[in-house]
Amino acid sequence: MKLNEIRERFIKFFVNNDHEQVSSSPLIPEHDPTLMFTNAGMVQFKNIFTGAQKTEMKRAVSSQKCLRAGGKHNDLENVGYTTRHHTFFEMLGNFSFGDYFKETAIEFAWEFITKELSLDKNRLSITVYHTDDEAYEIWRKISGFSSDKIIRITTDDNFWSMGSTGPCGPCSEIFYDHGSPNLQEGDRIVEIWNLVFMEFNKDEEGNLHKLPKKCIDTGMGLERIAAVMQNVHDNYDIDLFSALISKSQEYCGRTENKIAHKIIADHLRAAAFLIAEGVLPGNEGRNYVLRRLIRRATRYIHLLGYNDSLLHRIFPVLIDSTSSAYMGAELVRAKSLIETTLKSEEENFKDTLMKGINLLEKFTTDLKSGDTLPGESAFKLYDTYGFPLDITLDVLKEKKINFDQKGFDDAMGEQKERARAKWAGSGEKSVEQVWFDLINKFGKTKFVGYEFNEVSDAKILAIVSSKNEVIDSAKEGEKITIILDKTPFYGESGGQVGDTGSLIKSDRSIIIVENTNKVNDLYLHRCIVKFGSICKGNTVAASIDKERRQTLRRNHSATHLLHFTLRKILGDHVTQKGSLVAPDRLRFDFSHNTQMTQDQLFWVEDMVNSLIRENLSASTKIQSMNQAIDEGAMALFGEKYGNQVRVVKIGDSRELCGGTHVEHTGEIGLFKIVTESSVAFGVRRIEALTGQEAINYVRDNEINLKKVAEFVKAPVSEITSRLSILSQEHKKSETKIKNLYKKLVSAENIKSTEINGINFISHTFTDIPANVIREFVLQQQKPKTVIAFTATEKDKTVLIIKVSKDLINKISAKELISIAVKKNCGGNAELAQTGCDSNKIDDAITAIYSKITASKHSTSYHHEPSYRRGANKQRDT
């Protein structure tokens, strides 16, 4: 049975048993600062399990994308060396939220594996927590197993907890015996399904208290059960991985070194799904995890003797293997971006890889099996050459050389601490518990803003102070957050900023709504009491700022047209990476590896404005996620969607979107791109204006053009040619002025002082540019000479020092200039330049003179130096 069929059977089985199918949440967890990546099926239900979030759902089933390659949960180093570890994997799971418990959960599991999958009961065994007599007896009744097949485990392996406190409970694991005597024990008998019975709440003292609602959380690794169903002992022999490995073997022309091929297949799969969610290679956080995956795979590709980029060539096999699943659709939509990113990162890493491998070979030349590589050496590779530690460890493992982890950690020091602070967790702000409490108490806010701009009878359900404390009332001047039973105010989400407006009581008390946010469909009206007072339970007339809302509608619809147009002109690899829909502008970040040309920007502008002039109708409809995707709707990577989604259709553009939009594109008016720039590797940004803001922008540019035309004394149509002529004339004038400066410099009465065979030449130039003086200094080639010139122009003084080449082994220009201005300066032994205080020129020159005098070239011969003002004349240079 193939992997895709197992997934489909699992979902169908539990849907037929009254479970609601829930789509996989993104790999990037939402509102959870404790996790870098989603690493289990229960992550998206965590707040339901803890009671922080209410739900009408009683039962759920999902196939969850998981990644364990960073943060606390990291299987990266095990991948390739074991039969069952992966960085990316799918977790099949069924969940109960206060509905069924142990007996039903065990019945479901037993029925699925023995009837749906027809597994041989004789190859199965069960573990339970040693004090969980209930689970033990249920298993005996349902399976008919004797006591030797139901094993009591005393360790915490069979007691699961969400953290040091909170929901927890015993668990029961189902194991499968592959049966081959040639397998090691850990590979022969494998866990295929874990059933967690959440029935306790652990307090800070470690005491267990019964939960009011008992829950079920199960997890079965899809790859592991696929290995069982396909009668293979290694997860990498299942249909998905065998196809990827066959293709890498075909390209590399080598079938040996199974470890390398496993790593390539696993890391390609993980990298592809990360890129599909909008993660791109970088040096911090999740971006760095992606970079590590690609670079580690690249190292093994080169180890197999393939010296070209390979991952993007194998990627189509991954698409073919997963295309029947919804997750495969993600890869199809992001195909161009994934291939481009993989190829680019591989090629960029080639030089670093070869340099790093060569240096590591040097570091380990004199080391033999059992020796230890100093941590400082590994850190040098990592810090100076950008060579990943993972690859260093892989090479050492192959050579059976130990690694000095402590030495590496010590060398990393503060730098490592800073890096860890940046990538530990998702970086998102945690959501205050007060909002979850209010959601549980009042449920979702009813949003009526699609149909109405105001409601006259909104009831105040709760008032929260600026300290996030629930209060009964607020008076004039206080800043508060108000929860209404229904609202026309759009809560900030999907890139669109929140609405503003007012709440007015019957006694004419006025509350200004300064912003609106949203937490799990609870709308937070950020307010200030402008006049009067407000109390919990009051009824208010809630009105949005209609004119501001209309500008948001224009900009949001224009963003959809821009996205659609970019994909038409640049290609299907373009996907949204971020956006801002504000009243005065829109900003759109998208995947694209190169700067757009001016012609491309004009084409985009023209196409968007053409769609606006067509006055296309904008429509919305609610439909299932799968149906929306099948009809071509764009889902934004990283966003979490429910089973029912809102689709906004404007012409041929279809996007999943909860924002507000115009009814017809003609309302947008004019669309004008202001800037196009780079945000990060592979991500571009367009900022644009619509409506009156766009007209104002064009008008301002027209006014400025007319001012320029008046200044250069030419018609607007001839500004370019006139400026070209003026530029040429300016260059000629600059050349003439520079030549005049050179003559002035040459005409200066520059003196030199001899210090025991060394010519010390110093002079201060006034009102002559430093670049002219520098050029003059560079032309001086007299041997055994030290030059110290200062140039003062427009209250800025520059010191330039040059030492002739025959002296630089004994006297350094960089050292002299640092002594002169009493600070560390740049430059080199022959030439150095820095700014200095015009009032301390004499002190600087004196310091240089003293240093030359004190050098080993000098004797006890002393005389009055010529650089002092009023000094005796020395010989001319």
UniProtKB/Swiss-Prot annotation:
Protein role: Catalyzes the attachment of alanine to tRNA(Ala) in a two-step reaction: alanine is first activated by ATP to form Ala-AMP and then transferred to the acceptor end of tRNA(Ala). Also edits incorrectly charged Ser-tRNA(Ala) and Gly-tRNA(Ala) via its editing domain.
Top-level EC class: ligase
This protein's domain notes: Consists of three domains; the N-terminal catalytic domain, the editing domain and the C-terminal C-Ala domain. The editing domain removes incorrectly charged amino acids, while the C-Ala domain, along with tRNA(Ala), serves as a bridge to cooperatively bring together the editing and aminoacylation centers thus stimulating deacylation of misacylated tRNAs.
Similarity comment: family membership: Belongs to the class-II aminoacyl-tRNA synthetase family.
Residues engaged in binding Zn(2+): 556, 560, 657, 661
Cited Pfam families: DHHA1 (PF02272), tRNA-synt_2c (PF01411), tRNA_SAD (PF07973)
Any GO BP annotation: alanyl-tRNA aminoacylation
Reactions that this protein is recorded to catalyse: tRNA(Ala) + L-alanine + ATP = L-alanyl-tRNA(Ala) + AMP + diphosphate
Keywords linked to the UniProt accession: Aminoacyl-tRNA synthetase, ATP-binding, Cytoplasm, Ligase, Metal-binding, Nucleotide-binding, Protein biosynthesis, RNA-binding, tRNA-binding, Zinc
TM annotation in the entry: none
Localization per record: Cytoplasm
Official protein name in the record: Alanine--tRNA ligase
Single Gene Ontology MF annotation: ATP binding
Cofactor note: Binds 1 zinc ion per subunit.
HAMAP family (alphabetical): Ala_tRNA_synth_B (MF_00036_B)
